[in-house]
């Protein structure tokens, strides 16, 4: 987040801190802290200093039990565990592309208004919305979300090395309740406290939130107006998003090119770099850097707005998925160069067939809607373990072939 920690950079630091904590068990760090009820009473002083009334504090914290399961959760973001092509195929899926096009039509007036107000392209917003909550499908899904106060309180009380961050976010969440923007019972989100359509942390809700639908409160839940507008404001103010510019280009480069750094696209052209589409670059004076995620895979020239998206999540693969999903929703095609070892992107019908075949074999895939969620991934892993495949939970064509063999 510009001068502030990025929304996910803070979480990444906290995740790293949790690694050693979880390896030794939650009890070790907790034993060095005062008992939770005493901590809650001591923390009241901090809350009062932020203008939180005793009534609001008691409502949230009075009978709260810490959700210590957060200590044992996976410590790393998935961007760092999957092959890049798997990460992209999972997120820039046929379901997300089709659903994104539907949302683009359904919310065209809202997205146009956001573009006018903040200068952020509608397809960038659709990419983030699709990535963060599957266009709202996961916002209140209990299999993906949990009450945030038990989780944040556990982290603020017992997480050893990023305690100040979690304390601040717990206070921010309490301020939201004090202002009447959110009801504690309805404030559910990720284990780390990210909420709503575009997964706002409490600090983002407080400082970047916008009452875009004019209902008198700011909320990342319900209609997506406030969530999308607040995220566009975030990209504009903290990411310095530039209106009217893209995020970058897939390119072809001469063999053995050694040029690096950030330079005008005209300089890259002089070095032999060309758009993979064969089209001329529309803004030769725009500055860009060259990036190839994996050897022998596609190569990209990344411009400023790619980094604006990274202000929301600093992982390159996240930003690439957001931008590529937005492009696919806009009607553009897949990358010209495939990733080495990549399977073709499964169609919606193929994903549905995977789910149907898993269900027929006795695995709970959670439905046959063509969206791969936690239930489908768990069912895939169980099947993969049974048949001796790598249990990566990936719903691909190799898996479909094995399922067809097992029928």
Roles of regions detected by a PLM:
Residues 1-18:
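N-terminal secretory signal peptides and thylakoid transit peptides that target proteins
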Residues 39-46, 110, 151, 354, ...:
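A general alpha-helix detector
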Residues 405-407:
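Short, solvent-exposed mixed-charge patches
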Residues 346-351, 359-403:
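Short acidic, glycine/serine/threonine-rich helix-capping segments at coil-helix boundaries
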Residues 3, 22-50, 59:
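C-terminal segment of N-terminal export signals and the immediately downstream linker at the start
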Residues 293, 298-304, 334:
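An alpha-helical appendage that flanks or caps ligand/catalytic pockets
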Residues 54-285, 300, 309-321, 325-326, ...:
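Catalytic glycan-binding domains that act on GlcNAc-containing polysaccharides
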